[in-house]
């Protein structure tokens, strides 16, 4: 009788490891366009700088590749069964950071933040309590785009103070919430946010929009401690001498 070959975990490594970080897939997330799978954190961070799949190089989505991501819960369960102790290790790490991260940052009582995290439904996870004040900053002009005769023009007005400064990690979704709050819009009311006439996805960060959509380039980032004619090479808080202009309007349903 032929003996069955015993399979080792390393035999399955090509199927359960992330192409980006080379570790075991954590919250495996699949790109629906090409069906390549990566760690959720790895692929979300990759899409902040690129619209292409890191493995095959194909464009995932022209403007918002995060819409093409799906969590693979079945693969996650398979990995937990193949790799002894992985589930328990992740649970211990999660508990550790829940207990220690707020105390380390001194932010036990702070409210929700603007850090983008895609969950199973694609909404933003706002459990993190860091305001990102130490992040590079960007200046933005929020301009009301008025279309004559468009439904909703009477509801959406221009802001009294339309210039803001925020973290480069702020997402379009957070900007929409800010506008809804300032304009006192109903919770069901939806807005479009545009840059150079192109509608931006809710998970786009300000840094991503600046680098890929705004016509001005990195030379307009200035250090707060330098003169307007200097470009500072130091790391630290930055601002844009010519604010990036984002326009907003009532959402248009093209369906």
Curated annotation (Swiss-Prot):
<dbReference type="GO" id="GO:0035102">
    <property type="term" value="C:PRC1 complex"/>
</dbReference>
<dbReference type="InterPro" id="IPR017907">
    <property type="entry name" value="Znf_RING_CS"/>
</dbReference>
<feature type="region of interest" description="Disordered">
    <location>
        <begin position="97"/>
        <end position="132"/>
    </location>
</feature>
<feature type="compositionally biased region" description="Basic and acidic residues">
    <location>
        <begin position="109"/>
        <end position="119"/>
    </location>
</feature>
<dbReference type="Pfam" id="PF16207">
    <property type="entry name" value="RAWUL"/>
</dbReference>
<comment type="subunit">
    <text>Component of a PRC1-like complex that contains PCGF5, RNF2 and UBE2D3. Interacts with RNF2; the interaction is direct. Interacts with CBX6, CBX7 and CBX8. Interacts with AUTS2; the interaction is direct. Identified in a complex that contains AUTS2, PCGF5, CSNK2B and RNF2.</text>
</comment>
<dbReference type="InterPro" id="IPR051507">
    <property type="entry name" value="PcG_RING_finger"/>
</dbReference>
<protein>
    <recommendedName>
        <fullName>Polycomb group RING finger protein 5</fullName>
    </recommendedName>
</protein>
<keyword id="KW-0863">Zinc-finger</keyword>
<keyword id="KW-0539">Nucleus</keyword>
<keyword id="KW-0804">Transcription</keyword>
<keyword id="KW-0479">Metal-binding</keyword>
<dbReference type="GO" id="GO:0006357">
    <property type="term" value="P:regulation of transcription by RNA polymerase II"/>
</dbReference>
<dbReference type="GO" id="GO:0008270">
    <property type="term" value="F:zinc ion binding"/>
</dbReference>
<dbReference type="GO" id="GO:0060816">
    <property type="term" value="P:random inactivation of X chromosome"/>
</dbReference>
<keyword id="KW-0805">Transcription regulation</keyword>
<dbReference type="GO" id="GO:0140862">
    <property type="term" value="F:histone H2AK119 ubiquitin ligase activity"/>
</dbReference>
<keyword id="KW-0678">Repressor</keyword>
<dbReference type="InterPro" id="IPR013083">
    <property type="entry name" value="Znf_RING/FYVE/PHD"/>
</dbReference>
<dbReference type="GO" id="GO:0005654">
    <property type="term" value="C:nucleoplasm"/>
</dbReference>
<dbReference type="GO" id="GO:0031519">
    <property type="term" value="C:PcG protein complex"/>
</dbReference>
<dbReference type="Pfam" id="PF13923">
    <property type="entry name" value="zf-C3HC4_2"/>
</dbReference>
<dbReference type="InterPro" id="IPR032443">
    <property type="entry name" value="RAWUL"/>
</dbReference>
<feature type="zinc finger region" description="RING-type">
    <location>
        <begin position="18"/>
        <end position="57"/>
    </location>
</feature>
<comment type="function">
    <text>Component of a Polycomb group (PcG) multiprotein PRC1-like complex, a complex class required to maintain the transcriptionally repressive state of many genes, including Hox genes, throughout development. PcG PRC1 complex acts via chromatin remodeling and modification of histones; it mediates monoubiquitination of histone H2A 'Lys-119', rendering chromatin heritably changed in its expressibility. Within the PRC1-like complex, regulates RNF2 ubiquitin ligase activity.</text>
</comment>
<dbReference type="InterPro" id="IPR001841">
    <property type="entry name" value="Znf_RING"/>
</dbReference>
<keyword id="KW-0862">Zinc</keyword>
């Amino acid at each position: 009788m032929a003996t069955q070959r015993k399979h080792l975990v390393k035999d399955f490594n090509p199927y359960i490891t992330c192409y980006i970080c080379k570790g075991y897939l954590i919250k495996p997330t699949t790109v629906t366009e090409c069906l390549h799978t990566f760690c959720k954190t790895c692929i979300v961070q990759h899409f902040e700088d690129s619209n292409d799949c890191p493995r095959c190089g194909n464009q995932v989505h022209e403007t918002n590749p995060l819409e093409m991501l799906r969590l693979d819960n079945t693969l996650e369960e398979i990995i937990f069964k193949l790799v002894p102790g992985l589930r328990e290790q992740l649970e211990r790490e999660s508990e550790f950071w829940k207990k220690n991260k707020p105390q380390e940052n001194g932010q036990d009582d702070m409210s929700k933040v603007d850090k983008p995290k895609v969950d199973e439904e694609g909404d933003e996870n706002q459990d993190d309590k860091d305001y990102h004040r130490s992040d590079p900053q960007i200046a933005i002009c929020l301009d009301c785009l008025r279309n004559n005769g468009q439904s909703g023009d009477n509801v959406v007005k221009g802001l009294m103070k339309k210039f803001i400064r925020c973290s480069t990690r702020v997402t379009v979704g957070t900007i929409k919430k800010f506008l809804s709050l300032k304009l006192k819009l109903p919770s069901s009311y939806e807005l479009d946010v545009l840059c150079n006439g192109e509608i931006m996805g809710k998970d786009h960060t300000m840094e991503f929009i600046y680098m890929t959509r705004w016509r001005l380039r990195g030379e307009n980032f200035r250090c707060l401690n330098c003169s307007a004619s200097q470009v500072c090479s130091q790391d630290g808080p930055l601002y844009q001498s010519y604010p990036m202009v984002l326009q907003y309007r009532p959402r248009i349903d093209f369906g």
